[in-house]
């Protein structure tokens, strides 16, 4: 009996769309749900029913059997017949602090029920298991592990001490950069005009040094700046690496952080076998089947590891008719559905 694919993703996610479409084109059954959407109460208007899911969980356990199913919109998902999960989003719906206690309880029970149903998908292949992502989705943990496995890494300091930060910056002969330690991005609408909080990787300038006392408010991540020829994105799918060189040095805005430009040229890159094996071994130790990993290619052709995004994007590196990363993701997921 063929098993089905379950995709956990936000409703508007082109990467989830691409995987779903290609899997179904190959004759497999694929279901989608967004864990971050609130389960609605009964008695909704027609308009509300269009965008809130009709959600119903059935999970039972006896001495003889385990039965689990989920109805989501018009999908009735037999969770005991899921062979693989493609997980892009495992954040759950939350309620504001000002909400009544009844809604807090409802949301807590929604999270616990859906989390439990996902954790009890027996014998299921995950790309990736989100409960394994959380412990390693941290720049400090990744830096430590990269060092342990033998990848080249930049000198790094995490501190909220102005004196320590200043000494570190002054010791970096090629300059220093500052990075956001967390991945959070916040939008403040209180003024009527949305303001985004969070920052790109940036050079610590002379002007920034004048305000270095501000690091005392929270830990900040400093690294030595790495002069580079290009940024290298190594997208790992299972035991395969798809590497691209990004022409980040071709534009002033993207020299330090290529995310500042959206139309940079890229080309496939011959990733060194030894470094590739080291990277794969590190990701396997984390239990990851997918990661988008960022390196610098230095001017003397060394690869320096920066970080791994375990839910990173890849379609921006691929063409409409040539998409080897997408093909490999779908091939790996589909191979788990034919048992």
Q: What do the predicted segments below correspond to?
A:
Residues 2-6:
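Extreme N-terminal starter segment of soluble prokaryotic enzymes
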Residues 10-22, 33-152, 166:
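Conserved N-proximal alpha/beta basic substrate-recognition cap immediately N-terminal to
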Residues 23, 170-271, 277:
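Phosphate-binding site of ATP-dependent enzymes
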Residues 26-31:
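A generic structural motif
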Residues 62-64, 73, 236-240, 248, ...:
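Short acidic-glycine loop/turn motifs at beta-strand connectors
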Residues 149-173:
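Rossmann-like NAD(P)H-binding beta-loop-alpha module
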Residues 155, 220-221, 290-293:
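A short linear hydrophobic-aromatic micro-motif
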Residues 266-277, 281-288, 297-339:
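C-terminal active-site "lid" helix and adjoining low-complexity regulatory extension at the edge
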